[in-house]
């Protein structure tokens, strides 16, 4: 970890073009590691990483794009953890920035109703598995009431891309209802993790 809190494997000059999904992923994994290990170094590491992330985003030195934009909610796993521990306002502000810069999956619902047969962020099956937990990880931080929106999204996804085992079809992107379509393993894992946070 750098002195300023940065934790990703790139030099300072490259940060502006670095996809910060890595920040979101690393902090999510470290949160899970802490839950298993109770390693007291982790909360301080997470605090410093997220404070640095916040400062870079709020200053405009970096912005979400690519994976970071389409997986912004992943970062909120750690933001929730640190907020519960420290309760500082900048963590709620970070959540707002991530939501504002992140993709709104409601805009892609129309694309879930038929296989688009080409790769796109909004129908990427792993992104969708991750996305289901969005409301669960944002409500407390953003002061919003929980509406069970994940169920609405699930109903659309299941209706047009569902399987008998409650997963969605997709090798990279949603594949429709054909019984010959499978499901990418990463999507299974991410869907399970979303359900863990939802229920």
Language model feature labels by segment:
Residues 1-199:
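Glycan-recognition and catalytic cores of secretory/periplasmic carbohydrate-active enzymes
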């Amino acid at each position: 970890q750098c002195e300023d809190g940065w934790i990703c494997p790139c030099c300072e000059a490259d940060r502006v073009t670095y996809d910060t999904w890595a920040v979101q992923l690393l902090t999510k994994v470290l949160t899970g590691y802490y839950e298993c290990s109770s390693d007291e170094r982790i909360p301080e590491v997470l605090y410093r990483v997220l404070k640095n992330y916040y400062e870079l985003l709020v200053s405009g030195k970096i912005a979400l794009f690519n994976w970071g934009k389409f997986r912004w909610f992943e970062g909120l796993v750690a933001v929730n953890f640190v907020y519960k521990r420290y309760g500082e306002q900048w963590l709620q502000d970070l959540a707002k920035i991530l939501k504002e810069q992140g993709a709104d999956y409601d805009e892609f619902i129309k694309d879930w109703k038929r296989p688009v047969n080409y790769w796109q962020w909004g129908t990427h099956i792993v992104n969708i598995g991750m996305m289901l937990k969005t409301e669960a990880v944002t409500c407390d931080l953003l002061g919003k009431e929980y509406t069970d929106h994940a169920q609405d999204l699930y109903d659309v996804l299941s209706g047009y891309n569902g399987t008998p085992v409650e997963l969605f079809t997709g090798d990279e992107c949603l594949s429709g209802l054909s019984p010959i379509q499978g499901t990418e393993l990463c999507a299974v894992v991410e869907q399970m993790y979303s359900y863990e946070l939802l229920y």
